[in-house]
Amino acid sequence: MAASSIAAQIMNRPNAQRLIRSLNHDVIPLVTGIESDRLFDEPFEPFELEMILTDGQLIEIEKGLTVEILATPGHTRDFLCYYIQNKKILIASEAAGCADGTGQIFADFLVDYEDYLAGLKRLAALDVEVLCQGHQFVFVGEAVKNFFARSIESTERFRTMVEELLRIEGGSVERVVARIKAEEYDVKPFPKQPEKAYILNLSARVSYIAQILYERTITRRR
């Protein structure tokens, strides 16, 4: 088992453990078509890491197969991507954004917009033929470049939209979250992210942009 040093710290925090257990527990009733006794419902427990990964580190899996570690904070502070250069495969997960079944790409910066966008552009500059996003889809060939271009545009557009909604709603994060949820989540068909996790993630993104606007306002007043 391997992860970043930040992930190791987070995993040992009681509040993080409680959140992981809660989100895992909430999703079990949403799983259909599988007998309940076949579902793994043991609560999450922290575990020891065998290796700490760092940005730029090269790990030889076997002869001729090396994985490069890329630190891409922004989605979460501990987030890592994995690039197999000789096979042009990138396992980017949420750091690249996530397209759903409708084709919409979600910008997933939960902790830092600028870091997320910088990481996204870093990934887009790599020579990639196979892109593995966090959920549902794998993109290949020319679809990879198209995905990255759309993901960058979606990220920048989301920030602009949230800034405008915050102005309209007088800075209320709760009202902005409710408006966005009504337009992009409530009308979406299944499968989709569990509602609790969606609201948690959306609130984090809107709150971050609200903080940026607040700091900008304070700076102008000085």
Regions found by a protein language model. Name each.
Residues E42, T66-R157:
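Metallo-beta-lactamase
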